């Protein structure tokens, strides 16, 4: 037993096994996988050689013990694989850009080594293999292993290859990290090499070569920075995901070191899965005196996998492309996509359509003089408690590739924009992005928006229109990108909407902020026998079966939604000239209606016109169309009208108008406005849809007033002709 426990490992045999694996492992098509990678390295096409444990597992000559040793002593085996690659490295077969300085230095070193200089018997003068290498070796963990949370990584994992999931909260700048320090002696002229394996090292000052010792000369060493080897280095903070934090606990974070080709792969706000070596890091300086035997820990990253890719990075697989092509041919795709959002939440079809358009967005516009017009949609859901506002927010954050969820009461102005902190690596002041900066090119969901302090809420004004965060703190004056779509949820001023008060009193948000929202959706909880009964049945079904009732089609899964939206976002539709007058007329009519109203329901500004354009373009994107159609504009106007439907329906009840009478008034006013006795059916349907009425109500109105000889209906087209009485 004791002999087995103290079994020594023959690292020469391990190197031979690693070399055999690299030389003989075949890919899925029978090609030499790693030899092809080494050829690309020799041709200077790539620098990183990633060895996958999945390949080692399937290799016939590698046993379980070898796999276990690689997993438990990964740092040592990276060196073993690097030595094996040195022996297998082929000659270059293609011309590549030459680094003249590096090649001249290496040629000179080889010549000096042949003369007994750099490769002499003195170990400090022996050229380390690291300085010759122009590649980096990474070992990737098993793909099917469930990632650990930061809380689950224990002291027993020290030195092992682990896989951890989390969200990136901070990234340092990329700095050069010395890997091999090269010195030149003033007396003997020899090059002295010093390998650096830690973050700090003690430079050499006195030449230790044999020649200086024989001559009894204390040669002074000069550090040659140009001849030394540096590696890109970046420090990242990885924090536990919200769902992994036990109730009442603070999220834990872990320092991650990225080197070489892994730098600049992540940004704050990314949800990632990292595999790497869990290592201790002893304190140094005065902190070491206080810490004693205690050491800090960090993860030396070996591979990075993004949980949700950005839309522009999304690459469709073969089956996904076919599925999207089938969906695009579906005439009812707009409704199906919308109903696939949070299917367990009853109703809110139009709200879900608006949230779908928020995910799609419109392209950003940049004018010739540099002025930018945002393309992201901003939506505010305001309504009574218990109408599933927060659940909708959380579902959208789950579907979006990049999203940050926060609450108004728990967010400060600094927490939303940016804070100035001291970088522990360089002791410099650095900016740490807040929620809006973390959600750059994504969605920032702010719950309890009405409960934010006014001073904190003003920080959002610039983000919502200019899409930047301007900072002037601690000597740092800069502007950060915050190209985010804001999705806010708020309650009315008195908890519930009070119909006795004006909309402005109930909404209780400043006009400067309201005008920045493309859609302010009022969701009021009104008693209705049929609706309440359907909702109760739906909730009971979800509670018992843990899934939504049948929708008549299979709801699309979030990955499919992301794939469809990513394809739609690549389309850049334009507004044709023939629609310009139509949109302008629609906007002016909204302004006229608001001017006539005693208690206006919204603040209509020129931003409203831009909102109509953005929503129309988003609808065209969903159809993969290069041009905006009139139906897109009509749907955009309908959504804007339906967002206040609860208020309009109440106004109609107070004024004593039923749906039939109101539809007749709308059609009569349209005929008077156009000075025509005829109204086309399609145009009439668009008009009443904007006011929140259905096609069934329009047909009922047409039949009733046709029987009264007010108008005549065409038997085939249903066009309306007023009878001149």
Curated annotation (Swiss-Prot):
Start and end residues of each MCM domain: 333-538
Enzyme class, first EC level, given as a word: hydrolase
Any one GO biological process: double-strand break repair via break-induced replication
GO-annotated cellular components: chromatin; cytoplasm; MCM complex; nucleus; THO complex
Protein name: DNA replication licensing factor MCM7
Family: Belongs to the MCM family.
Keywords assigned: ATP-binding, Cell cycle, DNA replication, DNA-binding, Helicase, Hydrolase, Nucleotide-binding, Nucleus
Catalytic activity, reaction form: ATP + H2O = ADP + phosphate + H(+)
Chief location bin: nucleus
Binding site for ATP: 383-390
Superkingdom classification of source: Eukaryota
Subunit structure: Component of the minichromosome maintenance (MCM) complex, a heterotetramer composed of MCM2, MCM3, MCM4, MCM5, MCM6 and MCM7.
Originating species: Oryza sativa subsp. japonica
GO MF annotation list: ATP binding; ATP hydrolysis activity; DNA helicase activity; single-stranded DNA binding
Function: Probable component of the MCM2-7 complex (MCM complex) that may function as a DNA helicase and which is essential to undergo a single round of replication initiation and elongation per cell cycle in eukaryotic cells.
Enzyme Commission designation: 3.6.4.12
Subcellular location, record wording: Nucleus
Residue span of motif Arginine finger: 515-518
Pfam families in the record: HTH_MCM7 (PF24901), MCM (PF00493), MCM_lid (PF17855), MCM_N (PF14551), MCM_OB (PF17207)
């Amino acid at each position: 037993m004791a002999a087995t426990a103290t079994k020594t490992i023959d690292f020469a045999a391990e190197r031979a096994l690693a070399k055999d694996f690299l030389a003989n492992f075949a890919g899925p098509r029978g090609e030499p996988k790693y030899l092809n990678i080494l050829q690309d390295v020799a041709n200077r096409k790539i620098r990183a050689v990633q060895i996958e444990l999945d390949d080692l597992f399937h290799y016939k000559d590698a046993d379980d013990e070898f796999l276990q040793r690689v997993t438990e002593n990964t740092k040592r085996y990276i060196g073993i694989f690097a030595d094996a690659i040195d022996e297998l490295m082929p000659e270059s077969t293609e011309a590549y850009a030459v680094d003249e300085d590096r090649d001249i230095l290496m040629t000179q070193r080889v010549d000096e080594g042949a003369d007994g200089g750099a490769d002499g018997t003195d170990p400090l003068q022996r050229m380390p293999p690291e300085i010759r290498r122009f590649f980096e070796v990474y070992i990737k963990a098993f793909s099917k292993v469930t990632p650990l949370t930061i809380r689950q990584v224990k002291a027993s994992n020290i030195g092992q290859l682990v896989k951890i999931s989390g969200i990136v909260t901070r990234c340092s700048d990329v700095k050069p990290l010395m890997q091999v320090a090269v010195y030149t002696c003033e007396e003997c002229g020899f090059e002295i090499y010093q390998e650096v394996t830690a973050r700090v090292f003690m430079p050499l000052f006195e030449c230790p070569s044999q020649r200086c010792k024989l001559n009894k000369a204390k040669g002074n060493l000069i550090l040659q920075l140009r001849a030394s080897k540096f590696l890109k280095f970046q420090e990242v903070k990885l924090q536990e995901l919200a769902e992994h934090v036990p109730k009442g606990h603070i999220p834990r974070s872990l320092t991650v070191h990225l080197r070489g080709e892994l730098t600049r792969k992540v940004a704050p706000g990314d949800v990632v899965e990292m595999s790497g070596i869990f290592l201790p890091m002893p304190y140094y300086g005065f902190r070491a005196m206080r810490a004693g035997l205690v050491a800090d820990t960090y993860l030396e990253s070996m591979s990075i996998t993004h949980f949700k890719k950005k839309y522009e990075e999304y690459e469709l697989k073969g089956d996904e492309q076919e599925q999207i092509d089938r969906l695009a041919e579906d005439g009812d795709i707009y409704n199906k996509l919308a109903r696939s959002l949070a299917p367990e939440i009853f109703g809110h079809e139009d709200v879900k359509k608006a949230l779908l358009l928020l995910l799609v967005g419109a392209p950003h516009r940049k004018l010739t003089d540099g002025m930018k017009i945002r393309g992201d949609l901003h939506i505010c859901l305001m309504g009574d408690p218990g109408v599933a506002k927060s659940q909708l927010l959380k579902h959208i954050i789950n579907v979006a590739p990049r999203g940050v969820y926060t609450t108004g009461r728990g967010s400060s102005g600094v927490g939303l924009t940016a804070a100035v902190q001291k970088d522990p690596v360089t002791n410099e002041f650095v900016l740490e992005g807040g929620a809006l900066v973390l959600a750059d090119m994504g969605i920032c969901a702010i719950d309890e928006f009405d409960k934010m302090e006014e001073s904190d809420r003003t920080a959002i004004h610039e983000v919502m229109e200019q899409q930047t965060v301007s900072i002037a703190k601690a000597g740092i004056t800069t502007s950060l990108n915050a190209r985010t779509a804001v999705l806010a949820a708020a309650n009315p001023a008195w908890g519930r909407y009070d119909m006795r008060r004006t909309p402005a009193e109930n909404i209780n948000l400043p006009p400067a902020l309201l005008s920045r929202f493309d859609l302010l959706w009022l969701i009021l909880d009104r008693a209705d026998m049929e609706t309440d009964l359907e909702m109760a049945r739906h909730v009971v079904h979800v509670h018992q079966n843990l899934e939504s009732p049948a929708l008549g089609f299979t709801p699309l899964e979030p990955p499919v939604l992301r794939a469809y939206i990513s394809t739609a976002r690549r389309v850049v539709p334009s507004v044709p000239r023939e629609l310009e007058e139509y949109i302008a007329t629609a906007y002016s009519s909204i302004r006229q209606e608001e001017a006539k109203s005693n208690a206006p329901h919204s603040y209509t500004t020129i931003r409203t016109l831009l909102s109509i354009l953005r929503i129309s373009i988003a609808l065209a994107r969903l159809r993969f169309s290069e041009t905006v159609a009139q139906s897109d504009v009509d749907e955009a106007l309908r959504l804007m009208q339906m967002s206040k439907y609860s208020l309009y329906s109440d106004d109609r009840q107070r004024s004593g108008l039923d749906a039939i009478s109101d539809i007749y008034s709308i059609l009569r006013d349209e005929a008077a406005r156009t000075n025509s006795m005829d109204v086309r059916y399609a145009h009439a349907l668009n008009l009443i849809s904007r006011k929140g009425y259905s096609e069934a109500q329009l047909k009922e109105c047409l039949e009733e007033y046709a029987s009264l000889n007010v108008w005549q209906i065409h038997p085939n087209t249903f066009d309306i002709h007023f009878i001149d009485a």
